[in-house]
């Protein structure tokens, strides 16, 4: 959520910056609500002051006017007016809150303007793209050849966009996630955290998935409590949700920053906005595993910490020796809560394209304001909002798909990345 005072005092600045990302701020609506809020708050304060004065001095007035019934009636009337206006003000404040919750974050001044992914700025490339002297296969064909996928059973059990893995491919999938966790905890200093996959929906408002992206979520209802709303719980689309909400309503000590957390969880997405795209394989599924890295940082450090976190995600790809490129997302391609985002895109030879395997974003204080997460700043001697940074480190399914394609052999075998062979795959060199 944006700072409400920024809208109150610099609404034209906010309007122009939001326009960069294609969002049209309704200045008239906000101005009218703010005008009404000021009037109501002033009236409530005036009436409350009169009520307090009369109540405070009623004993003294009683000595002057033995019959004080009229005074008591005035106090009762004032109290009723105050209650009515407070109720009206509460409704208005809720409307303003909903208005603010639907406004995306301001894009960083240094990211490129653009209309979509074609306008993203390539920052760097790493790795050597192989030349194959045979007809290459995609990851679905390769996995099927090794009897590692069971798409039919997955569809029978759960429907489309689900997968079942078996044997050595299932093993590789499992150890990939373990390798990522080990790297981030042992070398990068993150604290491994186990979190729920089912969360109350207020947590999704906190990180910014709600209210705008409600159709991209899977919801759950408890049949044990009929009073609960149908959408009271949801399956997490990313571990960013529970990890960030760990700091809801917290006031941290400045010395605690930065806080670095990592979690591997199943993630669930309806992919409602991706109908007809990547309907086969591991690229776009309703359920997938992802290792998420999150940092809770001091505002003065957040941009530098974004660079650091992105390097941590890149390290996974480098150790696996997977060719990738790093792109800086343009204004209309960044996520709702993000101010600046880097995408890491791994090479898929069967498609002759790079595909996203990680997004690393700086949310500034956007999420912190929504969850009321602050720290005590020693220099300013006051409580200010933290900054939140997060990224995929990495999406396990897409990483597996990239390994299958980039490490495929002419005879259909898959060479296992060297970093995984002895420590994770019991010395196995090939999937065959």
From Swiss-Prot:
Subcellular location field: Cytoplasm
TM regions (residue ranges): none
Coiled coil: none
CDD domains reported for this sequence: SerRS_core
Disulfide feature: none
A Pfam family hit: Seryl_tRNA_N
One BP annotation, GO: seryl-tRNA aminoacylation
A cellular component term, taken from the record's GO annotations: cytoplasm
Record GO terms (molecular function): ATP binding; serine-tRNA ligase activity
Reactions this protein catalyses: tRNA(Ser) + L-serine + ATP = L-seryl-tRNA(Ser) + AMP + diphosphate + H(+); tRNA(Sec) + L-serine + ATP = L-seryl-tRNA(Sec) + AMP + diphosphate + H(+)
UniProt entry keywords in alphabetical sequence: Aminoacyl-tRNA synthetase, ATP-binding, Cytoplasm, Ligase, Nucleotide-binding, Protein biosynthesis
UniProt-annotated binding residues for ATP: 269-271, 356-359
EC number: 6.1.1.11
InterPro entries xref list: aa-tRNA-synt_IIb, aa-tRNA-synth_II, aa-tRNA-synth_II/BPL/LPL, Ser-tRNA-ligase_type_1, Ser-tRNA-synth_1_N, SerRS_1_N_sf, SerRS_core, tRNA-bd_arm
Pathway: Aminoacyl-tRNA biosynthesis; selenocysteinyl-tRNA(Sec) biosynthesis; L-seryl-tRNA(Sec) from L-serine and tRNA(Sec): step 1/1
EC class of the enzyme, as a word: ligase
The protein's role, per its UniProt record: Catalyzes the attachment of serine to tRNA(Ser). Is also able to aminoacylate tRNA(Sec) with serine, to form the misacylated tRNA L-seryl-tRNA(Sec), which will be further converted into selenocysteinyl-tRNA(Sec).
Subunit structure: Homodimer. The tRNA molecule binds across the dimer.
NCBIfam families, sorted: serS (TIGR00414)
Family under the similarity heading: Belongs to the class-II aminoacyl-tRNA synthetase family. Type-1 seryl-tRNA synthetase subfamily.
Domain notes: Consists of two distinct domains, a catalytic core and a N-terminal extension that is involved in tRNA binding.
Protein name: Serine--tRNA ligase
Source organism (scientific name): Buchnera aphidicola subsp. Baizongia pistaciae (strain Bp)
